[in-house]
Amino acid sequence: MQTISATYGNLSLVIPAFQEENGIRQAILEAEEALSNLNLSDYEILIIDDGSSDSTYKAAQETAALYSHTRIIRHEKNLGYGAALRTGFEASRYEFIAFTDADCQFHLEDLAKLFDNIKNSDIAVGYRFDRQDPKLRIFLSRGYNLLVHSLLGSGVKDCDCALKLFRKNALNKILPEARNFFVNTEMLHKAACHNLNITEVPVRHRMRYAGKSKVGWKEVPKTLKTLVPYWFSNHLFNASETQGTISKEKKGNLLAYFTGCVILLLFSALLFGARLRTPLLEPQEARYAEVPREMLLNNEWVVPLLHGKPYLDKPPLSYWAVMGLYQIFGIEDWAARLLPCLCGIAIILVVVSWGYFAGAPWEGLLAGFILCLTNRFIYLERMLAPDSLLCLWTTLGLCLGYLACTQKKMNLACWLGYSLCIGLGFLTKGPVALVLLAVPIVLWTFLDKRTLKPSLGMWGFALITAILITLPWQIAVSIREPDFFHHFYVGQNLLRYVAPLDHEEPFWFFLPHLFLGTIPWIFLLPGFITTICKPNSNKQSMGSFAGFGLIAGVVIFTFFSIGGSKRPIYLLPVLPPLAIILGCQVMALVTQKREKIVWQSILIPGTEGSFNFLGIILLIGLGISFAGIFRGLLKPDTGFLLGFLFLTSLCIWVIVKAALPDKKMSFAVTGAFLFLTLYLGVSELLPAYNQLFSIRGQLRAHLKFEKKKPSLVVCYPHLWDSAPFYLPETEVISFSRSEKSQMILFLNQRPNTLLLIKSGKDRKELVQELPQHLEFITDAQQGTVTVGWIRKKSDEHLQGNLVP
């Protein structure tokens, strides 16, 4: 008798089973018959009963007793399809391991095809070329395969086909963690990450032998709940943060890092500390300087005051901070502006420290530089408003929340700091702080499975801490002002968000502000998206630090975009997470070997000579734009717009010019150029702009030749907050549009009155309606508000030298 030599080696076949009492016998019979005819040296069949409550286990035992190759392993409770497979894989003894389902939908003779194709591969997977499932099952499977291919770039036609063959050493590298039907996707993605060779083989398919499929609509959300976090943690942001850690052995790296920190601190101090004496702009800065002034003069620490009346639109923390600065430095506009400037420097330091403690020090340092050299951040964070302080609490809170959840066990000190930031943010701007700080942490801990998920008790602790911080003030102000709750929570928060009375803008309102305000760094964003979404499964360029920055930035940006009321300063909390994203992208660019840098895609010069000529033209255009403003050749708005366009183009030109050949030098030159440009802006352009368009500048111009300060100032159509701030000893009254006739009568009785009126239509109508013997005299350049005198036409101006 001729003996047939074995050609395939030893095989372990794993068959998970759950509630398969009517089909498990047939599954074992078919497996024994097919494997006995496969020319195997030896084989074993492992039936994994996943806690079935029917007679699956009993039927499997009875059938296995007839064969020496079949073993039964039982879970005491149902752990899931993936858990059953892993149990079988770990119990397997042989060099080749295959698995199939207990529904008998595959012809196990096709394992021979898989063996034939695994000779030069690590894994052989089947794909069903003649699928016999119900239409719903086929629809769900095809949709899922399309989704997996789009997200993970697996490249496998039929990833959930339950007929696969592995080499044991390869399988040990990709053992699944998922317990549900996501197990196939997970193993294939891990195989791609380990550069394992995968061969696809067509296999036959048929209807179930008995029972009902366990896959249906109910499995879709369960699988997505596993797929999306896996995609986020293992594909988009799968790098280890320790890759960028500063090597202690290399003192040069440590010296370079701390030198960079010192330079960044110097840049921040110069950009935020320059020309703080610029006048306050209406209406925002003047209001938030006047409220703490009135509170301080009235020794009022509970109820914010504006024009002597309760002003309950915002909580008092930013007012308290400005009051403290007034007490130290006196009631000055520059003292009030110290608050946002100190907040701006602190935010940059928080971002750098965040990266350091997160294991991404260079990314954090680069993010700090990008934030410091972002024109929108410098402009908005120098502006006096509660949003500046809110941005600090938001950034610090997100940093501490991130660090609390990325340790081996929950860092209670960081979580306490996170909780305090929620309370302080609430005391600065209201319940919006809870949304900005809680939603990113909740979403991130769901998506990134490498993190610790805060328990309900931890969230309760955070909420109680925030309440303890804010409740004393809320109780005190409610006792004094019974209408506080409705005005603050309903009017200023809920209705302002869903049905605003002012500042209502379309959904896309922030997009142009974000784009123009972050040039040139925003051009890194497409490269960042390309980097994280590229199909290479084994890429490792971005880690959890970048992932959290993306989540936080998207959540905050979306929240404010959905809201009805929109103002440009609401963008502030978005900018630190965006800087983190772009800092990680810069780090990826300067550390990866690439022939071309991303900036080169912005502009491709025809020749070196023409490119240099373009730079000269842009520089000349920039100079002409701002020279035209100060010489009166161009309107200020036109000149600033042209100057900004030329400046932006020049920034891009410098970046492209510096991109060859050293990428690090490219970004260094770009940063230096941006710093010089921004410093010019904050030291010369912004003060000039504020001087031209603020009320302080116009008041000085009109009072320059007066012998004494005016005893009365009239405001129309509302009270301008700069008037009482800069003329604290002067009586200030206001008239609304409905009171125009009374105002004209009042001015007729009180000529020689200083009038502050809104420019445009209001000013034009008033001039037309004044009595013939009165005239409105204004010599100062108009801004939002026009300042002038109401005088009798025969009056002569008194000469003097009084300058407030």
Each language-model region and where it sits:
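Short beta-strand/loop segment that forms part of the nucleotide-sugar
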Residues: 39-52, 73-75
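Membrane-integral, polyisoprenol-dependent glycosyltransferases
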Residues: 250-599, 724
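Hydrophobic helical membrane-anchoring modules
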Residues: 1-9, 153, 176-258
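A conserved acidic beta->alpha catalytic loop
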Residues: 49-58, 104
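Membrane-embedded architecture of ER/inner-membrane glycosylation machinery
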Residues: 257, 416, 531-804
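N-proximal low-complexity "stem/linker" segments adjacent to membrane-targeting elements
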Residues: 1-33, 40
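Conserved donor nucleotide-binding strand/loop of the catalytic core
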Residues: 46, 57-91
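Acceptor/aglycone-binding surface of glycosyltransferases and processive sugar-polymer synthases
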Residues: 75-91, 96, 105-181, 208-226
